[in-house]
């Protein structure tokens, strides 16, 4: 296998692939995504002209699909790193093809160099995160791929070149996938907490999270980051949920209540209750605190006299779809070409 490097390979939207993907593939993918019976999957796709997202919503409305929060698929390997300093924090993901490579010294040195280079840039130039990052309410900024590749290692080498060198050394595809950064506001009393799960080395593991808060201790902020890794929230609070996401959830819930025969005012109360339940699942402040489930995260933070500012979580390979290979066919092809 010849080594190569790709920057920020992201999962395409299912709708965009519809014209290029066979009907059997769409059925297979939606079946794996939802766990619904194949008969229902095929019926939903047929009813919606093989629009997989519309079919997915229809299956959810019938209670045949897994919750959106659990629908993500993690396939790719590699490692993530969390690194904080006095004036900022970064989360970084580098992908490899195998866990064996991810545990190797050269790969772990690479991801540490990536995190250190990014943190140096963030702390030396606060504007960098604003000029080269995409803002999302309540989250760290997602840095653009072209800027990450230009950052320099401690010996002056661009990160893109450092990745290429490691790819050549380990003989695998290695890629800088994504980075999130936060530049702390001087004098604002912001506290940064981090947590790394599945540690491969100090600050490097399979999943990591960062929480930025005010008015709490660093120890408590680290506990909040641990909660983020354990509970996988998607948004900081309910007002951070994008309007289109909220409308989509409401539409699914409304479809589920159709034909119930209940008065309109009762239906609206049911919808409000289901939305509140949704917020409890996906919003950090609304979740039950893992260290004390008698209160929400928001109440736990307020009990410490603080408030949440932002958070982000990164899990190795999350959102990347990897082609499933027929092992027997792969071996046969290898024999044929040797």
Swiss-Prot record:
Subcellular location field: Mitochondrion
PROSITE patterns per UniProt: EF_TS_2 (PS01127)
GO biological process: mitochondrial translational elongation
Gene Ontology MF term list: translation elongation factor activity
InterPro entries: EF-Ts_dimer_sf, Transl_elong_EFTs/EF1B, Transl_elong_EFTs/EF1B_dimer, Transl_elong_Ts_CS, UBA-like_sf
Primary localization class, coarse: mitochondrion
General function of this protein: Associates with the EF-Tu.GDP complex and induces the exchange of GDP to GTP. It remains bound to the aminoacyl-tRNA.EF-Tu.GTP complex up to the GTP hydrolysis stage on the ribosome.
PANTHER family (UniProt xref): ELONGATION FACTOR TS, ELONGATION FACTOR TS, MITOCHONDRIAL
Family: Belongs to the EF-Ts family.
Protein name as it appears in the record: Elongation factor Ts, mitochondrial
């Amino acid at each position: 296998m010849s080594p190569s490097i790709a920057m920020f390979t992201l999962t395409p939207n299912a709708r965009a692939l519809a014209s290029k993907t066979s009907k059997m593939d769409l059925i297979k993918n939606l079946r794996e995504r939802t766990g619904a019976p194949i008969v229902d999957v095929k019926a939903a796709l047929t009813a919606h002209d093989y629009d997989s997202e519309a079919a997915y919503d229809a299956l959810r409305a019938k209670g045949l699909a897994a919750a959106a929060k659990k629908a993500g698929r993690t396939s790719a390997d590699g490692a993530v790193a969390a690194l904080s300093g006095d004036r900022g924090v970064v989360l970084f993901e580098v992908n490899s093809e195998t866990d064996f490579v991810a545990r190797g010294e050269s790969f772990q040195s690479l991801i540490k160099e990536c995190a250190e280079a990014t943190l140096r840039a963030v702390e030396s130039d606060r504007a960098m995160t604003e000029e080269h990052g995409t803002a999302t309410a309540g989250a760290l900024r997602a840095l653009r791929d072209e800027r990450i590749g230009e950052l320099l290692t401690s010996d002056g080498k661009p990160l893109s070149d450092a990745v290429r060198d490691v790819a050549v050394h380990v003989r695998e595809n290695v890629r800088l996938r994504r980075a999130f950064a936060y530049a702390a506001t001087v004098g604002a009393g912001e506290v940064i907490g981090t947590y790394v799960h599945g540690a491969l080395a100090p600050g490097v593991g399979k999943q990591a999270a960062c929480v930025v808060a005010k008015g709490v201790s660093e120890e408590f902020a680290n506990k909040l980051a641990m909660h983020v890794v354990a509970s996988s929230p998607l948004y900081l609070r309910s007002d951070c949920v994008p309007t289109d996401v909220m409308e989509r959830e409401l539409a699914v819930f409304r479809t589920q209540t159709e034909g119930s025969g209940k008065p309109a005012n009762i239906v609206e109360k049911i919808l409000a209750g289901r939305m509140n339940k949704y917020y409890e699942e996906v919003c950090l402040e609304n979740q039950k605190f893992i260290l004390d489930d008698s209160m929400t995260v928001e109440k736990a933070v307020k009990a410490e006299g603080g408030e949440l500012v932002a958070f982000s979580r990164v899990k190795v390979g999350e959102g990347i779809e990897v082609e499933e290979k027929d092992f027997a066919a792969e071996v046969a092809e290898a024999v044929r070409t040797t």
